[in-house]
A protein has these predicted regions:
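N-terminal regions that are enriched for targeting/export leaders
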Residues: 2-56, 122, 338-357
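Long, contiguous internal "core" modules enriched in hydrophobic/ aromatic residues
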Residues: 3-31, 121-271, 288, 292
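Juxtamembrane "helix-exit" motif on the non-cytosolic side of transmembrane helices
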Residues: 31-40, 178-186, 311-318
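Transmembrane-helix bundle segments that line or gate the permeation/cavity pathway
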Residues: 49-154
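Hydrophobic cores of alpha-helical transmembrane segments in multi-pass inner/ER membrane proteins
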Residues: 53-64, 92-98, 134-146, 198-212, ...
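C-terminal TM-helix exit segments that contain a strictly Trp-centered aromatic cap at the helix terminus
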Residues: 94-106, 236-243, 308-313
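Membrane-interface transmembrane-helix boundary segments in multi-pass integral membrane proteins
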Residues: 189-196, 251-274, 315-346
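Extended, compositionally biased non-globular segments
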Residues: 261-313
Length: 357
């Protein structure tokens, strides 16, 4: 695979960087003009960060999986996966606005030793600890991604891949609580980390098939993985809801009660339709799963549904105006990420190897 093949079109890269810079400038202007809206701005940035970071982490997991299992799908998706995974160090910078906004976004941040909270929660949920966990996880993810992209096939690369998958599952479980579940500090779900992992895989597969149409010989594998991710997402989401409903746990029910107010329920139903029900129906026929064109056409709907789901997770606590702010944040984070990942990184930092091996 040549380095040139990893480049996005130059015009697309410039447009992405321009959009990212413009979105960032608008958000910064809003912060200066409306300092009282810090919570809304932080929540919007978190939504954009979760969406694009999810694609990059999905690429890391797929590269690690392919290093262990092999297959045509990895070779076919390599030009899209490698720049996305190698871009993970960028998120050490993109996370900084969230770090600055931690104190306004999370209810536990102003008073980490509130008497109503358990000793364990007081020791775990605090600004230094949450910041350190986030930065360490991003640093390790970045190192793993650069190793997987740069190393040749062999036992050492497989060992890195195996250790990376174990670390990722632990890290995404912890950060899923830190960044999302702790928006309501009394809520926690042991399946949230796995659900996040499945969404990352789904988002990255959709992104890769849209960015670079899958060759016909690899399309059935990619379509099968997409269908498995859709089924996994449906199962984990429903089982979490069922356990909480059946257990009648008031502190956990509050999470769902808040997200059924205003139009939040409609938002999640639309997300469910786009990211789960529609793809499930479309991908059931094997002819569709094996069609590169069909997968590429389905991808935007999947990505849109995943983005709406991220908004449903984060936005209700901050209010309706988080949604337009989130749209700007998606443009800002995504523009900067895409422009740098598929321009600078794809051209300069990714070594030409066969199938990333």
């Amino acid at each position: 695979m040549s380095a040139e093949a990893l480049h996005a079109r130059p015009g697309r890269v410039r447009l992405a960087l321009l959009g990212g810079a413009g979105g960032t400038a608008l958000l910064l202007a809003a912060l200066l003009v409306l300092p009282q809206a810090r919570e809304i701005l932080a929540a919007g940035w978190l939504i954009g960060l979760l969406f694009w970071l999810g694609i990059a982490l999905g690429a890391l997991v797929l590269l690690a999986t392919h290093a262990l299992t092999g297959g045509q799908w990895g070779r076919a998706l390599w030009p899209a996966l490698a720049p996305a995974a190698a871009s993970l160090p960028l998120f050490l910078l993109l996370i900084l606005p969230l770090v600055v906004g931690l104190g306004t976004l999370y209810p536990w941040a102003p008073d980490p030793e509130h008497a109503a909270r358990s000793i364990v929660a007081q020791r775990y949920l605090n600004l230094p600890g949450a910041t350190l966990r986030g930065l360490v996880a991003l640093a390790v993810w970045s190192a793993l991604a650069l190793l997987l992209v740069g190393m040749r096939a062999g036992g050492l690369r497989q060992m890195v891949a195996a250790l990376g998958l174990v670390f990722h599952m632990v890290a995404i479980t912890l950060l899923g609580f830190d960044w999302v579940q702790s928006l309501e500090p009394h809520f926690h779900s042991t399946s949230f980390g796995m659900a996040s992992l499945v969404l990352q895989l789904m988002a990255c597969l959709a992104w890769a098939t849209r960015l670079r149409p899958t060759p016909s010989e690899a399309a059935p594998d990619v379509g099968g993985m997409l269908l498995a991710a859709v089924l996994g997402s449906l199962y984990l989401g429903f089982s979490q809801y069922l356990v909480i409903w059946y257990g009648n746990l008031p502190e956990k029910v509050e999470w769902y009660v808040l997200r059924q107010h205003w139009g939040w329920l409609s938002l999640e139903l639309l997300a469910l339709l786009l990211s789960s029900l529609l793809p499930l129906v479309v991908l059931l026929p094997s002819a569709v799963r094996g069609s590169p064109a069909a997968l590429a056409q389905l991808a935007p709907w999947l990505l849109g549904g995943i983005l709406l789901h991220q908004a449903w997770l984060v936005a209700p606590g901050a209010g309706f105006w988080t949604l337009p702010v989130a749209a700007l944040a998606v443009l800002a984070v995504g523009g900067l990420w895409f422009g740098l990942a598929y321009g600078l990184i794809a051209g300069r930092f990714i070594r030409a190897t066969e199938a990333g091996a």
